[in-house]
């Protein structure tokens, strides 16, 4: 709590800056300023009523005891006696660094008070650090907490000390900026995380888009490959040997209309005669398809003719000789049931293809 003194107190050294005597041996104290006020029984010595600037030893003491209540400075409006002013003049060299520290503490703490909008007379240990305890006291009065009613020489010294405190103030401002940047560390980290997440999201979306594009290109490439392979297959089919499924009547018809092209026919017919041997290792037999009959010949050059059963359906593949009216077979075997079922469909497909082929060949 702030201790207020009566204006008519016997204390005449208000406004002076005493020198603290810390870390020294115990001895009979001689007050440097004046005797304490007799009206205030709670005051034991002069050093209890004054707030000293932060010194290294004082900082260590506050770090050990952070929860001590702040000390307040009492100001007496009385005049300074001549004996005390002489002692103050002898201690000008000590007062200058003290005032420099006070100036730096003022520039540091006033900024924080302006930001937090707190009262200058209260202090909370949860809001501030222990090192700032005495700085708050010094900034409550600022330069006015210094000696009042000093002479012109003291005021000049204060001005000189303030001019020398400018670099210290700049350093303190730099430290304050670094501290203020360090205080909201969690928020800054969260913002950094959010920024990284936000920066990561478009990158992730771009990667997905690229993957989709690559997948699309791969699909297109596969389609192109499939199309090219299909075209190759078609070309192979175009260049490959085609067997024309036909009955006896249609075979004779296509052979008559397409004379310049070599055609290989496939017919399904019933064996209507016995197999007879012929010249040049040949065997002859007769095939019947409804009302139409067709003589066939098979030359046993590289293989023998398998055993054929009269009255059964056989599959014969070969070339038709229109001049001799004979079908030269290269393959003869019994037809399966599936071939017999699908043969009529094959004949219709072949008729359509042969009509298109003959129309194109006639235009050429």
Swiss-Prot record:
Q: Name one GO biological process term.
A: fertilization
Keyword set, alphabetical order: Chromosome, Meiosis
Cystine bridges: none
Listed GO CC annotations: chromosome
Tell me where in or outside the cell this protein is found. Answer: Chromosome
Chain positions covered by the region annotation Disordered: 1-51, 70-189
Q: Which domain of life is it from?
A: Eukaryota
Q: What InterPro entries does the annotation carry?
A: Spata22
Indicate, by first and last residue, each region the UniProt record lists as having compositional bias (Polar residues): 1-13, 30-48, 73-108, 137-169, 177-189
What species does this protein belong to?
Bos taurus
The subunit structure is:
Component of a multiprotein complex with MEIOB and RPA2. Interacts with MEIOB. Interacts with the complex BRME1:HSF2BP:BRCA2.
The identity of this protein, by name, is Spermatogenesis-associated protein 22
Where is this protein chiefly located?
A: nucleus
Q: Which purpose does this protein serve, as stated in its record?
A: Meiosis-specific protein required for homologous recombination in meiosis I.
Q: What is the lineage of its organism?
A: Eukaryota, Metazoa, Chordata, Craniata, Vertebrata
